[in-house]
UniProtKB/Swiss-Prot annotation:
This is Citrate synthase 3, peroxisomal. The lineage of its organism: Eukaryota, Viridiplantae, Streptophyta, Embryophyta, Tracheophyta. It comes from the Eukaryota. The gene is CSY3. Peroxisomal citrate synthase required for the fatty acid respiration in seedlings, citrate being exported from peroxisomes into mitochondria during respiration of triacylglycerol (TAG). Indeed, complete respiration requires the transfer of carbon in the form of citrate from the peroxisome to the mitochondria. Keywords: Peroxisome, Transferase, Transit peptide, Tricarboxylic acid cycle. Widely expressed. Expressed throughout the shoot. Expressed in flower, silique, stem, cauline leaf, young leaf, mature leaf and senescent leaf. It holds the Pfam family Citrate_synt. Its EC number is 2.3.3.16. Citrate synthase is found in nearly all cells capable of oxidative metabolism. It catalyses: oxaloacetate + acetyl-CoA + H2O = citrate + CoA + H(+). It comes from Arabidopsis thaliana (Mouse-ear cress). GO terms for molecular function: citrate (Si)-synthase activity.
Amino acid sequence: MEISERVRARLAVLSGHLSEGKQDSPAIERWCTSADTSVAPLGSLKGTLTIVDERTGKNYKVPVSDDGTVKAVDFKKIVTGKEDKGLKLYDPGYLNTAPVRSSISYIDGDEGILRYRGYPIEEMAENSTFLEVAYLLMYGNLPSESQLSDWEFAVSQHSAVPQGVLDIIQSMPHDAHPMGVLVSAMSALSIFHPDANPALRGQDIYDSKQVRDKQIIRIIGKAPTIAAAAYLRMAGRPPVLPSGNLPYADNFLYMLDSLGNRSYKPNPRLARVLDILFILHAEHEMNCSTAAARHLASSGVDVYTAVAGAVGALYGPLHGGANEAVLKMLSEIGTVENIPEFIEGVKNRKRKMSGFGHRVYKNYDPRAKVIKNLADEVFSIVGKDPLIEVAVALEKAALSDDYFVKRKLYPNVDFYSGLIYRAMGFPPEFFTVLFAIPRMAGYLSHWKESLDDPDTKIMRPQQVYTGVWLRHYTPVRERIVTDDSKESDKLGQVATSNASRRRLAGSSV
């Protein structure tokens, strides 16, 4: 009996995984399609911006593109004289700067819209799976049945983590923060996969779509395994090998809870909730960590280092720690009766409200609506969290108060997610890891897109220099210390421990 082409493809994927050689599986490229780059027209904004420089009286014309953008470099031609280097755009936090063009996700913060490759996030959460969404983000279109099957199979076959990486995780303290573990392990993968490192194999290595796809599948497959190992390390337990017979979220829960029992199967309803949460967190255009990934990738660094850097950015409490802050806030409020006092404290700027407002959304975060509806499903299985009543009442109070409405402060994705994670038994320090696992799909989509973008250049922002203009070196004995020296210029005093004092009190012969 002749082996079908699809079976051959699967065998090729498995062979490529086992060999870890330079030759990559042809099956990946065959079954993965490229994106449809057509974009629905929103109405052309093309034109010309005329600038009158009142310093010189000169007029300048700056082209405006179809999508309403201007090139920052065009402002360099606006000068006052030969010594002038031209205008720079000062934009702290990149509030109105677009360093890339992307077709991966679309956000309209005023209308509360999030779309993955044109698909509304609500539709994807209701109907799709995380791996299908990851494929969509990566390749631009929803997969066919055979493409999805082969994609899921390939990810499953690359879910095992090198023993050396597991040894690194096991060597860390039991109380090591799991995000620190994830950053370290993801970075270590670069060492264990030198075949995919441009610094070792040449800058053109990622010109091969097969090489790219293999790294994508490796990271998507290994991320939950590393995360599970970090979780188990906190509990003092050894890592559990992934199962090859379970869906993505189910497999993650299996590694957390099976205790090595190969017949264990997680609750399918909880696994589905986690899968939906993964979908909601998979991508969110140029957020801090995704921008970090593209920034690093622009240098030509290997994808593992770029992703590790992105996870490091997500580790920051201003980016990935908001749902933990929400839990702390709700716990401090305690009961529904304390909400009016808390609201007044927020309005008087004596208290801080976490989980409301967003850099982009000036409307209800569409992801928050989906997550709110997931809460009852989780509570029906594991029991109701008493803080959910506080959360619902706080949301109602805020959305009926002109102070918050006028400022367009609405619940964001973090407002309810922490309650769900806690109800599912995850400790607060693990919440950001649950954010990082699915966001790998977004990081990798942007990495892949940047490789194909002809406008990609190594990122090297300008600065506005505010320091001393010029001074000359003075020998140390001739320097004068004045009383008005800036406090920031002085070396901070480092406290000496008693152990150091004991050692210094001794002598050596």
